[in-house]
Amino acid sequence: MTNEEELVVLADEEGNAIGTAPKATVHTTDTPLHFAFSSYILNPRGELLVTRRALSKKTWPGVWTNSMCGHPAPDETNADAIRRRGVSELGLDFGSFLDIQVVLDDYRYRAEDSSGIVEWEICPVHLVRLAVGEFVEPLPDEVEEFAWEEPQKVFDAVDATPFVFSPWMVDQLSHPELRQAILEAFDPEA
């Protein structure tokens, strides 16, 4: 999709696809409901990748958030979109994806940033396990900085200072099943 216009899939309130719109124009003060995905990426040691959104981002610039978010292209599965964005946005090796599982299948949210731009998404939340290493080389226009952290440290930080993190990350981590899935992902006793 490097030379093509990136499209997002629009949705109705029931979660049906109803068309497409250019990603470059869809996020406004009157953003239509559309499909997205959110992912939490773990390395083989069970550390969670957290990213700080680039300062040039249209929404929530400079805010810490989960590993990666994005939009599936028309006729693309979320798992394929996660692989595509993981390679293009984070510089992950395509072969490093061990497992992608949906944890919050029916997650959706609406949030408005300080500039009035709205995110309104049907956004299943995924847990991604990497088979090897943690080499990340993110695109500077997507990610300002990143860190691999122990999941419990991330949970504690989100609980103590939610204003430092994206509203979707704070809301997603309010679901105990997501926290449990992250903690158990590489736990041999789980």
Swiss-Prot record:
Annotated Mn(2+) binding sites: 27, 34, 71, 119, 121
Pathway assigned to this chain's UniProt record: Isoprenoid biosynthesis; dimethylallyl diphosphate biosynthesis; dimethylallyl diphosphate from isopentenyl diphosphate: step 1/1
Catalyzed reactions per annotation: isopentenyl diphosphate = dimethylallyl diphosphate
Listed GO CC annotations: cytoplasm
UniProt domain Nudix hydrolase: residue ranges: 32-171
Pfam families per UniProt: NUDIX
Record localization: Cytoplasm
MF annotations from Gene Ontology: isopentenyl-diphosphate delta-isomerase activity; metal ion binding
Active site: 69, 121
GO biological process: dimethylallyl diphosphate biosynthetic process; isoprenoid biosynthetic process
Cofactor note: Binds 1 Mg(2+) ion per subunit. The magnesium ion binds only when substrate is bound. Binds 1 Mn(2+) ion per subunit.
Residues annotated for Mg(2+) binding in this entry: 69, 89
Cofactor(s) needed for function: Mg(2+); Mn(2+)
InterPro entries linked to this entry: Idi_bact, IsopentenylPP_isomerase_typ1, NUDIX_hydrolase-like_dom_sf, NUDIX_hydrolase_dom
Statement: the UniProt record of this protein carries the keyword Iron: no
Alphabetical keyword list: Cytoplasm, Isomerase, Isoprene biosynthesis, Magnesium, Manganese, Metal-binding
Disulfide linkage: none
Superkingdom of origin organism: Bacteria
Enzyme Commission number: 5.3.3.2
Biological role stated in the UniProt entry: Catalyzes the 1,3-allylic rearrangement of the homoallylic substrate isopentenyl (IPP) to its highly electrophilic allylic isomer, dimethylallyl diphosphate (DMAPP).
Entry's family note: Belongs to the IPP isomerase type 1 family.
Protein name: Isopentenyl-diphosphate Delta-isomerase
Lineage per the UniProt record: Bacteria, Bacillati, Actinomycetota, Actinomycetes, Mycobacteriales
Designated gene of the protein: idi
